[in-house]
Amino acid sequence: MLKLLIVDDAMFMRTMIKNIVKDSDFEVVAEAENGLEAVKKYDEVKPDIVTLDITMPEMDGLEALAQIMAKDPSAKVIMCSAMGQQGMVVDAIKKGAKDFIVKPFQADRVLEALEKAAK
């Protein structure tokens, strides 16, 4: 089982991802509601993959991505956002994200991104 950290300020989005992965090779080991929590939880649980929302309070996902990548350049992070603007996608990939999922997302797309990042 690969360990997954889910980061989103919306509980229903975290629950949706948990439901999508419940019968897969991914185990949710931690959740966070903002970027500050994400960085802390990343250090605590050392997940294999992180799903990371962009728009969150306290610290946004792009800043959390930068901090995680600075600590662990091999981190596997998948960005999730309702804002699929090309510039934001490019920025996330340049900062080290392995993939970008636009909300609302489909189960197949989430699993595809996770499996791709796991390789």
Curated annotation (Swiss-Prot):
Q: Cofactor(s) for this protein?
A: Mg(2+)
Where is this protein primarily located?
Answer: cytoplasm
Description of post-translational modifications: Phosphorylated by CheA.
Q: Which residues form the Response regulatory domain?
A: 3-118
Note the superkingdom of the native organism: Bacteria
Quick one: which gene encodes this?
cheY
Q: Where in the cell is it found?
A: Cytoplasm
For Mg(2+), which residues are the binding ones? 8-9, 53, 55
Q: Which molecular function terms from Gene Ontology are attached? A: metal ion binding
Quote the record's cofactor note.
Answer: Binds 1 Mg(2+) ion per subunit.
The cross-references to InterPro entries, in alphabetical order and at most eight, read: CheY-like_superfamily, Sig_transdc_resp-reg_receiver, ST_Response_Regulator
Task of the protein: Involved in the transmission of sensory signals from the chemoreceptors to the flagellar motors. CheY seems to regulate the clockwise (CW) rotation.
Q: Which parts of the chain span the membrane according to its record?
A: none
What would be one Gene Ontology cellular-component term for the protein? cytoplasm
Fetch the Gene3D superfamilies from UniProt.
3.40.50.2300
Swiss-Prot/TrEMBL keywords = Chemotaxis, Cytoplasm, Flagellar rotation, Magnesium, Metal-binding, Phosphoprotein, Two-component regulatory system
Q: Which GO terms describe its biological process?
A: archaeal or bacterial-type flagellum-dependent cell motility; chemotaxis; phosphorelay signal transduction system
Know the name of this protein? Chemotaxis protein CheY
Q: In the record, which positions carry 4-aspartylphosphate?
A: 53
